[in-house]
Design a protein with these regions (language model features):
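Nucleic-acid endonuclease domains
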Residues: 1-138
Length: 138
């Protein structure tokens, strides 16, 4: 795992502790590492979401994830997962992410174990124009 993935793991746990499901209010639980597309799900209903924990959130952009898995999911007709952004100031919920909000890029991934960095197709979220709900003010 990379350092960013470790921080994301901590952010997912924090979301599960601090906020309830945006749909029904019940407890959110973390999905297993490596679960495709989603990070948390509701313990009571079928709600699932992607969680991002940006270090410096400006309200506009958030680093996404690997492009390849999302691209394959979209090609088979899956919907884009809702997004929960866990920043220093608040927890935001973006229920609908259009395809136009994705900005593709090639990332250099630094390995935690010191191995050579690798190039990986990624995407970022452009959230500037998207509607959101504040789930929690910190």
């Amino acid at each position: 795992m990379t350092i960013r993935q470790d921080k994301g793991e901590i952010g997912e746990k924090e979301v599960c502790e601090l906020v309830g499901c945006p749909n029904c209010g019940k407890k959110l639980i973390q999905l297993p590492k490596g679960f495709p597309l989603y990070d948390v799900q509701c313990s009571g209903c079928m709600f699932r979401a992607q969680v991002k924990t940006p270090m410096n959130f400006n309200g506009k952009n958030v680093s996404g994830a690997g492009w390849n898995i999302l691209d394959k999911a979209l090609k088979v007709g899956m919907i884009i997962p809702p997004l929960i952004v866990n920043s220093k100031d608040e927890v935001r919920f973006y229920p609908y992410i259009p395809k136009t909000a994705f900005k593709r890029r090639i990332a250099t991934i630094k390995q935690k174990n010191g191995n050579e960095p690798r190039l990986h197709p990624m995407f970022d979220y452009d959230l500037e124009e998207l509607k959101y709900y504040v789930l929690l003010k910190k």
